[in-house]
């Protein structure tokens, strides 16, 4: 079963890039055409790159690794938090703090402080303090939870990072590359593909596109967790096809072109399986 379908991506607007005047020439090889001044991303390539990224994430998690989900733009915040939480992975969906990876020792101390404040609140540690002291401690706890709450259980730097919008999250990309942590990311037409180890060409501005591709990565994590536990993959974790709006004629044409291509790839394999059976000698009576 395909990890994600062409129709799901078309429904989610994954194929829409930026305006033709706002692009990175290095992305030329991932662009199919332009329409009304907007670049159209080649979703056939996207499918191929999704498979590569999916396999990498699954194997990484299956061998005990963790994936940090990063997306602080409004379009990605909700899906980053919900999908990472669903599969038990750390995430950053508010503000990326400089040194979150390269200076993790200091960040880890702040995490311990957050847990200390939460324990104080739950066990009555705030009692006997002045209102001003309680207010200051509460504000400190709220601020720490807002910026670090998603990585509260991250005991060490992650094995890989999933990023929505490498331009906005340039600090996260730079820190990951400095530590040789593999970067998996959506590549919109204004991104630099040289900064990403496992690129997925697609729209990083549309809410539904970011959510779909984040769900794909989360599903790979879920499958890796199950493989680690020796369980079979949960089919329900795969992205579900949304109803979506009716496709435009040119989008339907893209979809119709994708089907024959998939059939053409499958045909040689089917013929190869059938050939040995046809060549087998007849059994004598």
Curated annotation (Swiss-Prot):
SUPFAM superfamilies tied to this protein: Ribosomal protein S2
GO MF entries: structural constituent of ribosome
Top-rank lineage group of the source organism: Bacteria
Gene3D superfamilies, per the entry: Glucose-6-phosphate isomerase like protein, domain 1 (3.40.50.10490), Helix hairpin bin (1.10.287.610)
Pfam families, A to Z: Ribosomal_S2
Listed InterPro entries: Ribosomal_uS2 (IPR001865), Ribosomal_uS2_bac/mit/plastid (IPR005706), Ribosomal_uS2_CS (IPR018130), Ribosomal_uS2_flav_dom_sf (IPR023591)
GO CC annotations on file: cytosolic small ribosomal subunit
PROSITE patterns for this protein: RIBOSOMAL_S2_1 (PS00962)
Record's keyword annotation contains Secreted: no
Matches recorded under HAMAP family: Ribosomal_uS2_B (MF_00291_B)
PANTHER family to which the protein is assigned, alphabetical: 30S RIBOSOMAL PROTEIN S2 PROKARYOTIC AND ORGANELLAR, SMALL RIBOSOMAL SUBUNIT PROTEIN US2M
Name of this chain's protein: Small ribosomal subunit protein uS2
Species, as recorded: Rhodococcus erythropolis (strain PR4 / NBRC 100887)
